[in-house]
Amino acid sequence: MFERIGGVLRGAASSVVRVRLRWLALLLAAAFLAGCVPTSPPEGITAVTPFDLQRYQGRWYEQARLDHSFERGLTDVSATYQLQPDGSVRVVNRGFDPAKGEWREAVGKALFVGEHDTGSLKVSFFGPFYGGYHVAALDPGYRWALVVGPDRSYCWVLTRDKHLDPAQREAIVARARALGIDTSALISVSHERQDPTQ
């Protein structure tokens, strides 16, 4: 009887170990894939130079974006960048989720990929895993920015003001189109609510 119980326990323990090993393998695979996300600009796109982070930091409002799960359905999206003493950049993304009736926030960290006078950074919201963030076009007065990610499926139009003149928007979108971005898939972002943190 005790041998039978012992055998059952050993079998259960072995099953638990197998499940844990499967989970570990999945986690390692996810970490590997996340680590493979490129941090350099997409081929054919050059990040803005010269780039002044002191002028770039502060709050930006998202006017348009290509759809991704981490922002899906959000309105009133803003991104705030703050230079830290260690040279990194604190990133705070906020947006309103109408389906849940609540504000959502994600806090991350950005680091320069190369020279600090080039608008090419890598951003992480999940521990050691970074993705590319590249300022592909920038207003001389730092009033608007066109940002692309690790590939052309990531694109954002950012402005200092909540609302953007339609003619100016079309000019920025035309720049994105010239860079090979599928601008027909851009989603316009409304800004009708007041963020309680602002």
What are these regions (language model features)?
Residues 24-34:
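Bacterial N-terminal signal peptides
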Residues 4-24:
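Bacterial N-terminal signal peptides that target proteins for export
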